[in-house]
Each structure stands twice: as structure tokens, then as C-alpha cells.
Amino acid sequence: MNFSESERLQQLSNEYILGGVNSPSRSYKAVGGGAPVVMKEGHGAYLYDVDGNKFIDYLQAYGPIITGHAHPHITKAIQEQAAKGVLFGTPTELEIEFSKKLRDAIPSLEKIRFVNSGTEAVMTTIRVARAYTKRNKIIKFAGSYHGHSDLVLVAAGSGPSQLGSPDSAGVPESVAREVITVPFNDINAYKEAIEFWGDEIAAVLVEPIVGNFGMVMPQPGFLEEVNEISHNNGTLVIYDEVITAFRFHYGAAQDLLGVIPDLTAFGKIVGGGLPIGGYGGRQDIMEQVAPLGPAYQAGTMAGNPLSMKAGIALLEVLEQDGVYEKLDSLGQQLEEGLLKLIEKHNITATINRIYGSLTLYFTDEKVTHYDQVEHSDGEAFGKFFKLMLNQGINLAPSKFEAWFLTTEHTEEDIKQTLKAADYAFSQMK
């Protein structure tokens, strides 16, 4: 494929935009470098770049675009609302309608607040939990990404009794000292942290199904034990469902798994492609938030009519019969095809799939923990990524990310993807 115009525009972008991208994950640093492809438009399962190349898209903006690009029902809703006004700074009926649809789908959201990103949503749930418990420390799990606020950019200490350290320049040590990081799926490490820190722990922050070091399921009983141990300690359980809400079924992962948290943060999919975030949970906890309580959270753009309208339209598409069955079927076809090719070409790789989302790891073991992904073969992934890109298959440029299917992918797309993977694997020996 010819990428000359993308390369030219990336050079121009470097003159004006820091690093040439507005989010570091969009660079190709993690796959060996090179100029990122500059996209021009998207329709359904496909993206088109500035050089006229067409791609089957499995990046899907890192997850939000579950109904494909420019879905006609959502596009129409956005256009209609834009003609009426995009921001009023007042309550609207759309906020009420959208909140009701969300609570109908996710019953634990007894009360809801909208913000503008997943980062904001998680950041605020932590503040609310601290206000409710009158404690300061939180526990998070290694490898889970919860946005870029100071509160969660914290790396693990040497063990559950050790405080975290900043995972980014600019994060104060004083903030990191309020965070304990333990391995996901390691209930003994979690018990040890709770036993050591006791009544200092306000909340534990959990991805119920991990989506930030690929797709990883909790081990049987893990979430149930986290809930029990936490509540016995007076610690709140916060689920970060920014990736997982409406990803696997019409609702949240918590309902699919049958384990209910105290608070939930959501975003990505629910905005229909527009900026959105939100949080909600038990009424008595949510009443800590202003104007009813002392925990302050506000936002000029929060609950804006454009995002509310897009979110309503998105849920109207997803609540139709057969949507998630199709995603699961396509995901199964893709997984089975890739596994056959891995065996055919004797590639050291494994796959985790959860319905219409999967991750291909270049490692020889089933992935259940972050360390396994960190030690997987990043060089092999980078080579595979570029071989696929040059055949018109757009993946996330990182070994830690998932492939996302949409309602608009087809069986023919899967066949083309597997044909491309067959060639890519053949070049990796």
C-alpha cells in the first residue's frame, strides 16, 4: 500500500501537534515506529485513509464504535440534535430519557451522573468513595488502565504491603502513596493488601473483565471474593466498565457475571462515538455528590444534548434482537480461523476471546495476568501489525490492546482478515 500522503501529513502534524498525535496510543512507537496512517472517513466496518486505501477496521477507536462508523440511525440523531442546539447549560429531557435507559439496562445504577470521559468518570468515583468512607487509600490491579488522572497513574510496589510509585512524570509521590497495586486474578495478594492496610482502604477499583491488557476474564470466584473481602472491611467496590458496558451484552459485565459493585464508571460505547462518561451506583453513596452532598463534581459539557441524543440512538440499535449473537458468532469464526493459522505456520501465539472482542498474544501460555502480556513478544506483534496494515487490516498498534468487532462486520470481512493473517504469519518464520 502507498502511504505517502499519510507520511506527508504526519510530518506537518509534528510541526503543530505535540508528538504529531493527540493521544500517545495513536503513535506507532509500540510497533517499531513509522508514521501513523491518517484516516479520512469511516463507514460501517471500514476506514479510508488520505491515500485512498481501504481498511477493515478492528481498532474501532479503541472500543466505542460497536455499531460501526457513521451508523445511519446514530448519524441522523446527531444531525437532528445539532440543528436544535448542542449545549444549553441547563437540564434537558434527553438526560432523563438516557438515564432511564441506562438504569433499565444496568440496575445497580440507582442514581447516575454524566461527565465527558472515562477518565473523569473513574476519577469522580474515587472521590465519591473517599467522601463516603472517610478514607483515602485505594487498591487497583496491575495492568488495568483507568484513565490518565494522577489518582490512577501509579505503578505497583514490590508487594501488596508496599505503596505504589508514580507511573508518569508529574504525578506526585504523595498521590502515589495513596494507591496500592496488586495482580489481577490473585485473590491472596488482594487479601494481603486488605489485611495490611485495613481501615485505610476507601475502595478497590476493578475491571470486571479486563480490557486493557487484552481481553482477560476473572478466574472463577475472584470477583465474588473481592466483593466479600472488601465489604467485610468497609471498603467500596468500584467497577470500571468504560470498556465493558454494552460490549458483551445489552447491559454491563457485572450483570453478565452476576457480581454487583457499589459504584460503576462507564463511557466509550454509550456515547455512540461522541465524548461521554458517567458514573452511578447505590443511592446512599451517590448522595455524597453535590448538590446533595459534600463531594464536588461539575462540568460545562456534562450531559450535553448532543451526546445524550447519540447515546439514546446507540442503545436503540443495541437493544434490537440478534445484535450480540452476531458479534459472538463473528468473533468465534475469527478466533477459530486464527488458531488454525497459528497451528499451520507454527507460530507461538494464543488468543483470548470474549464474545465479539479478542486479543492475539505472541506467547505460549494462556493469558490470565498482566505480567504474561508484558513479557509476550512485542517485536513479533509489531511485525504482524505492519504486515496486516499493508493488506488493509487496521488493528490497534499495541500488543496490549483488543480487536473489536462491530454490528457492521460481515463473514466476508472475516475471510479477508484470515487471508491477510495467513500471509502475515507466513512472513514471520
Swiss-Prot record:
GO biological process assignments: protoporphyrinogen IX biosynthetic process
Single GO molecular function: pyridoxal phosphate binding
Post-translational modification N6-(pyridoxal phosphate)lysine, affected residues: K268
Cofactor(s) it depends on: pyridoxal 5'-phosphate
Keywords: Cytoplasm, Isomerase, Porphyrin biosynthesis, Pyridoxal phosphate
InterPro entries: 4pyrrol_synth_GluAld_NH2Trfase (IPR004639), Aminotrans_3 (IPR005814), Aminotrans_3_PPA_site (IPR049704), PyrdxlP-dep_Trfase (IPR015424), PyrdxlP-dep_Trfase_major (IPR015421), PyrdxlP-dep_Trfase_small (IPR015422)
The protein's Enzyme Commission number: 5.4.3.8
SUPFAM superfamilies: PLP-dependent transferases
The keyword Isomerase appears for this protein: yes
Matching CDD domains: OAT_like (cd00610)
A GO cellular-component term linked to this record: cytoplasm
Cell compartment(s), UniProt: Cytoplasm
Pathway annotation: Porphyrin-containing compound metabolism; protoporphyrin-IX biosynthesis; 5-aminolevulinate from L-glutamyl-tRNA(Glu): step 2/2
Primary subcellular site in the record, as a coarse category: cytoplasm
Keyword presence, NAD: no
Pfam families to which the protein is assigned, alphabetical: Aminotran_3 (PF00202)
Alphabetized PANTHER family for the sequence: GLUTAMATE-1-SEMIALDEHYDE 2,1-AMINOMUTASE, GLUTAMATE-1-SEMIALDEHYDE 2,1-AMINOMUTASE 2
Family membership noted in the UniProt record: Belongs to the class-III pyridoxal-phosphate-dependent aminotransferase family. HemL subfamily.
Record's subunit section: Homodimer.
Protein name, per record: Glutamate-1-semialdehyde 2,1-aminomutase 2
Source species: Staphylococcus aureus (strain NCTC 8325 / PS 47)
Gene encoding the protein: hemL2
